[in-house]
Each structure stands twice: as structure tokens, then as C-alpha cells.
Amino acid sequence: MLTSANFIESHLIYRYAATILFVFLLLLVTDSNSSSFDVLARSNVNSVWGALTMEVLARLGVETVVVSPGSRSTPLTLAAERNPKLEAVSILDERTAGFFAVGLAKRTHKPVVLVCTSGSAVVNYHPAVLEASMSGTPLLVLTADRPAELRDCSSGQTIDQLKIFGDSVRAFHEMALPEVSVPLLAYLRQTLVHAVNRSLHGNAGPVHLNFPFRDPLAPSIDAEPIIDAHVLELQATVSTRPCECIGTRVGLDTVALERLASHHRGIIVVGAVNPREGDEAFADAVAMLADKLGWPVLSDVLNPLRGHASDSTALICHYDAFLRQPDQLDSLAPTAILQIGALPTSKVLRGWLGSQDAVSFLLTDRPVNTDPLHRVATPLFGQAHVLAEAMHHLKTDSAWTDSWRAVEAMTVASIDSQLEAIDGLFEGKVAWLLSRHLPVGTPVFLASSMSVRYAEYFWSAGNRACPIQANRGANGIDGTLGTALGMAHRGQPTVLLTGDLAFLHDSNALLATRELKGSLTVVLVNNNGGGIFEHLSVSGMGEVFERHFATPQSVQFDTLCQAYGVEYLHAATWDDFVTAIDGLPAAGVRVIEVRTDRKADKMQLNRVLAAD
């Protein structure tokens, strides 16, 4: 008869034997990325879990952990800081931290880890989580929490964190309480592997892991290690590096392809696309596709095409101007529309597309609905290069594309001559000059509202290969500066184009400038209020409009920058501005303020666009 004592003894023998077996297997494993798991990391159960978590994430290709201060997250924070493979960035405000991570992940296409304590700190991640979700940006949100016995009992700094982000995350997992046993350590490792995979593949986006920790949270400096380092080494061994993934080749429906190829008067519309395969490869694929189909390419500014204009003779960028001219519309009416990615920002283009009696095709590599016009459209799931290769057999003439190019050329000449002649400071000319004077390859982040719209109107096509990003997932001004800082971190000198309200809305991110490893130049167009509202009918409501919509703040930006130790320049003329952007600093943050009048900006914009 098996007594309780016998059972316990047998169980302990089994677990000891299993541990010995794992140590033996470890000797057969060669891992060039092995970590030491020092005594401090093995001094208590929470330290073990924190150390293993960060080591596994590092071996999966994660490079950066963005930490906000707090007590409950101590095991994760210390492990991130002590792991030599990881960079731990400390940002006080969780909202800024979240957007910093989004900006970095947008640029690198690798998941960035967020770590925060329990309570309201978690809630401050939500705007960034939403943006990451809607833009397909990989993010790993690790939140610390109280254990079950301290929940729902008025314990301090405790809220319901379970599935707090709702459907905005690709996956949620409530982690088990830390335990130093081989089965639980294996569970921890594989949960992390799944989380990284889930953040990257299929429909990339944020994943939330909630870590409950009991006291003691900090490692015990004088304690003996509670687990052998060899066991942890084995449990940290992973067989894949999901961050190093390749482009997905998806089979396309042959009937749909035949329908697509049968049209000789089609257009390709390319909106916001952040291609994982690389900017140049994406531009080459779209150029090949346009050449084989004989269709023009209407390109938003939020994809690589305008920066690689020599790759395509079919590129059309100024559609927002010439589609306002009634005499142009009939001759340009397509019979087919191929949309790649999201729709461009332009309301004029959206309205025109919605009025067309054309067959529509939607190409996307994410399982999301990208058609707010609700057309009867054929979905094509895959990447641009796969579709281009499927059309390699086609031979078409360029007459249809040439007609679009002729209209584009006349529009470009008109817009360029008008902008060149404008002596007074005008927000639209700021974007135009940036596109012509920034150093080759300069990453650019565009704030929402008018900054991204002026760039769509006036950003010139060329070969400067400037990667351009914006938070067009949720389209908010939240986290504008924080995202730009993340995008610039450990990258090339970067430029942010923003208005005054978007900048002020996230001015708390100036606290994070000391963590920046790199350079960010902020081009701040100060028109003392929300210029986008000037284009709405409510703008005629006088004081009500000014107080509740335009909301002028009258902030002295030189003083604000001085308070945070940020370099400030006032560009009073176009010569001042061009001189400032021709050479970007190698490190630090610099703000270039350009003061304009928002009501005059509106009138000037209407004049430029109406003249074509």
C-alpha cells in the first residue's frame, strides 16, 4: 500500500531524477547565446522567473525592454537591466513608454517589451496598445500584478488587469505564480515563445502577459541559490528565433488574377504600408506590378514609393489636387482598382474612388478589413511581390498610364512653381521643403491631423529613400513625440513633423529625451491651435470654435524646451529653415519652431490646390 509519505518520497525522487536528466541533456546542447544566471538571479523564486523570462526573450531576438518604475515589477525590471543581451530603457510615464516602444517596433519590425507595475500604470499603456493593434506593430506587454489572494479585497494599487486591453491584443495570458520546478519553468519558456510568435506572425500586434508576484520581490543578496544554473540554461534554450522571419508567400486565387489582368484601364492605389520585406523590395515589387499591368500607381506618402521614385515610371502623387478638377475626371475613370494596404489619407481620393463604377481588388498580408468605402471587392491575401510575379507573363502598352503621367506632370509643375514663390511662412511649404532638403535616408515621423495631410499633398517624389511613418492605426495625436523618440532610438538621425497641439499633447515625453540613443529633430509648426478644424464647417462659429475646437494654448516653446534641456531654434525665414534641416545633429533632441497663421494657411492651401 502506497502511503502519503511513500508518495511524497517517490515524487521527490522523480523530480530529482528529472533535474539530473535535464542537466545531462544540457551538456549535449550547444548554445552560443548562453547566459550565466548568476547567484543573484537565482536567489529567490521571483528572481528566477524574471531572469528566465528576459533570457528567453533575448534568445528569441528581442533587443529592447522599456521599463517604467514600480515595485511589483521588480523581478522583471532587474532581470532586464542585468541581462547583457538586452537594453533596458527607463521611461517614467507609461503612456510615453508605450508609444516609445511602438515607434521602435515600427522601425525594426521586432517586438519591443514593455514592463510596468500593477494598478493604473497598466491602463496608461492602452492608447499605445490600440495603435500597435491597428497598425500591426509587434509589442509584448508584461504587466506585474498582485497574486490572487490580494485581489478584490481593497489591497493597494490593485485593479482588475485580466484582459484589460480587450480585443486590442492578439493574445492574453495570465501567468502562473512563479515556482521553481522543471515543468513550470518549461511552461514559462514556451508561453514566451508563443507570445513572441503571436506578436509577429499572421496578424502582427501586441500580446499581453500578466505576471502575478508574491513578496519578496527583490532578490536576496545574501541568500544561497535555490536552483542550479545548468537547469536554467537548459530551460532558456529555444529552437527558433521568431524575430528573424521571412516574407510569407501566399497562393493567390487564379480566377481573381485572371479578372485582374483582363482590365487595361486600372489603377493601383497604395496607402499606408510598412513592409517587413524592406522599403526598396516593396517599391521594386509595386513598380514591376504596375509595369506588367500597365496601370498607374497612386501613392500616399506613408509607404516607400515616393522615396524610390526612380523604380517606377507610373508613380502618381498629386491626385488630391487634380481630382478636384471636374474636367479631368471623365478621362481618368478606371474599370478596375487594386488597393494595396490601407486607403490613403486623402478625402478627395476616397470620395472619387467611392464614385467609380469599377471592379475592386484588395491586396493585404493581414486579415483585416481595409475598405471603409464598403465596395464589392475581391480580397487578395499576400504580398506585393507575390502578385507581381504572378503577372510576369503580361505585356501591356503604356498609353493609359501615360495619360495619368501627363496630368501628374502638369500638376507637379503648377504646385512647385506656386510653393517656390511663397515668401511668407506656410505649413504646406514646410513639408515640401523637407522632401527636397533632408539628407538621404532620413527617417521621418508625421503627426496626425494636418502634418500628415500636408505631406500627402506636397511631399515630392524622388530618390531620397526617407522611411516615413505615422500613427495611422488609430489616427490619434496621442504619443506623437514618444513614438518619434522610439523611432529615432539607436537609428539614423530622425525628423518629426508636428503641429503645436500634437506636440503639447505629448510634451511629457520630453522627460524621455535623456534615454534617447540617437538624434531627433522636431519640426514644430506653431499656428497656435488645431489647424485641421479650420477646414470644417464649425470654423465659422467664432469664439465657440476658438475655445472648444481650435484651442489655442499660447505656449512659449523656447521656455518649454529650456526647462527640459532641449535645444531650440526659431526659423523666422525659409533660409533659416533650410539651413537648419540641411544638416541634422548626430545626437540629442532639437526643436525647430516655424510660426504660421492657421487661417492664412487654410486660404493658401485652397489657392494652391485650386490652381491646378
Give the ranges of each region predicted by the language model.
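Phosphate/pyrophosphate-binding active-site segments
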Residues: 31-44, 352-452, 559, 572-612
